[in-house]
Design a protein with these regions (language model features):
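Extracellular fibronectin type III
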Residues: 23-42
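Short, isolated positions within intrinsically disordered regulatory regions of eukaryotic proteins
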Residues: 17, 36-39, 107
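Conserved beta-strand positions that form and line the central face of beta-propeller blades
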Residues: 4, 37, 61
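Surface-exposed repetitive/solenoidal architectures
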Residues: 42-337
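Beta-strand-rich modules
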Residues: 5-25
Length: 337
């Protein structure tokens, strides 16, 4: 027999017990059952946050998966009062994202083919404090045809993300066939300080601090022979900004992998770092780090790098980091590890 309860609040715990009623005699003919506890399903996207006003002293509170999805919606739709640089968020509980088959990143980037620093709209620009909590069962599985693709829990970060732990799987594949950029990271896909801030940078802009990731990350250029793929446990590509006190754990069942056209860069912390700093970060595990190519056509210059902390650096500093990796490091002939 199936019973339906109506009028219940979403994502709320209830207790229920039952007792049989004989209708013909209109009397109860059994003892009460034991109390059973259950929790109602969450909405896909919440109507409001759990509290707060968005200031540093009174941040917007996130206690449910649907409220994290609301943050993604507010940033990606540029909702006034929720996406600006001075808006603060605080995670107040561990979250399980298993109800989202394909998570929409917080900050998708411009989605118009340009780098986010050329058009920083739809980047996360505020301050997100994870409160030491964990986001479990993250699943990002992007497939599309955009020239620039950046995915992670956060797609593009131009703000501050701190005190956050994430476990799950992040992947991106493009069907674009010319000069594509495909970037994937466990916490952040693409980390930047927008060019408009370069002369007067906001404090904390492009910062990832005290974060950790456990799981798999992959970025593939599909059939594009001219594409660039970057993947990292914390961040796929950092054009600038700082990554401090972060950690990636790559268990035996997990992989961080790129499949590029011309360029393929894979790192335990970041795939590539083109400015800024990585400091006091740790990479451990027994899984697989791989920088591969979709094709090796004649006439193309190809470039592959993989490393425990970062695959490739340019005008960036690496300070006080450690890598204790007992897994497999795979690169094509001629690549660098």
């Amino acid at each position: 027999t199936r019973y339906e309860l109506t009028g219940l609040e979403a994502y709320t715990e209830y207790e229920v017990r039952i007792r049989a009623l004989v209708v013909s005699g209109n009397y109860l003919d059994s003892e009460w059952s034991a109390w059973e506890r259950f929790k109602t399903l969450d909405k896909t996207i919440a109507d409001e946050f759990d509290g707060g006003s968005g200031t540093e002293e009174d941040p917007y509170l996130i206690a449910r998966p649907s409220q994290l999805a609301l943050l993604a919606q507010c940033v990606n739709e540029q909702t006034a009062g929720y996406f600006e640089p001075d808006v603060h968020y605080l995670l107040t509980a561990d979250l399980d994202l298993s109800g989202y088959e394909n998570w929409t990143p917080i900050g998708t980037g411009p989605q118009d083919g340009r780098y986010p620093y050329e058009n920083p709209e739809k980047a996360f620009q505020g301050v997100f404090d994870g409160g030491g909590h964990t986001v479990n069962n993250l699943n990002v599985a992007y497939t599309g045809a955009t020239t620039f693709t950046s995915v992670g829990l956060f797609g593009v970060n131009d703000g501050t993300i701190r005190n956050l732990h994430v476990a799950g799987a992040v992947s991106a594949t493009t069907s674009c066939t010319d000069k594509s950029y495909v970037i994937a990271g466990g916490i952040v896909g693409f980390n930047i300080i927008a060019y408009e801030d370069a002369m007067n940078t906001r404090p904390g802009s492009g910062a990832i601090e005290h974060c950790s990731f456990t799981g798999s990350v992959s970025a593939s250029c599909g059939n594009d022979p001219t594409g660039t793929a970057d993947a990292g446990g914390i961040c796929g590509m950092a054009e600038s900004g700082n990554i401090d006190f972060c950690e990636t754990t790559l268990d035996a069942a997990h992989t961080i992998r790129t499949e590029g056209g011309e360029i393929s860069m894979t790192g335990g912390i970041a795939g590539s770092m083109n400015g800024g700093r990585i400091s006091a970060c740790t990479f451990t595990g027994t899984g697989v780090l791989e920088a591969a190519f979709n094709t090796l056509p004649e006439g193309y210059y190809v470039y592959a790098q993989a490393g425990g902390i970062v695959g490739s650096t340019a005008e960036a500093s690496i300070e006080s980091c450690t890598a204790d990796f007992g897994g497999s490091l795979l690169i094509p002939k001629g690549g660098e590890a």
